[in-house]
């Protein structure tokens, strides 16, 4: 059974669709990269999957034991978020809020979950640092740690390497790949870098003028020019 299924999905704003009749499934352990032109609806799709906005039509179903509150989310950062005056530990712990319910404190288990997430992202030594004093790459590791506190099943990542230099980008991709391969966490990632998507993903969802969903091998078979032209498909 698929963890996530989208059936005849139509998403947009104010009743105006930006993406229509979308069908795809994501299974446990998949690494799906969502690619496409600017304005094609990638971030809108992700927000709709998360329930942050309603679909215009169609269905979004979860299965295989996955509940919507067990999906970790790493959004695109805003300038305000980058200047957030909280400690690294406080931000990572906030990812456990979905487990707390009405309880106004974090349990011992939740604190351990946060500590384990920071260790995986190699930021344990930054726990007491103020978030806004960190580099862009360190901030993204903090936000990924927070997302891990929400789930051990599925991560939704919206441009997780945006604005990072090549070295830090490669390190971030390696950490995400490790979570997928070693921990078995399903990854759904939006990326403008199709060459990276083709390196790491098991499946590709291309939206825009061209709509495609399938395995990486099937994508390369249908669009062989994607690799040759650095991932550009119209």
Annotate each predicted stretch with a short phrase.
Residues 108-126:
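Conserved ABC ATPase "signature" region
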Residues 203-216:
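H-loop (His-switch) and adjacent beta-strand-loop-beta switch element
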Residues 35-37:
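The feature captures the beta-strand-to-loop junction immediately N-terminal to the Walker
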Residues 130-134, 138:
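Conserved ABC ATPase signature
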Residues 166-168:
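Helix N-cap at the start of a conserved alpha-helix in ABC-type nucleotide-binding domains
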Residues 155-158:
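Catalytic Walker B motif of ABC-type/P-loop ATPase nucleotide-binding domains
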Residues 191-192:
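H-loop/switch region of ABC-family ATPase nucleotide-binding domains
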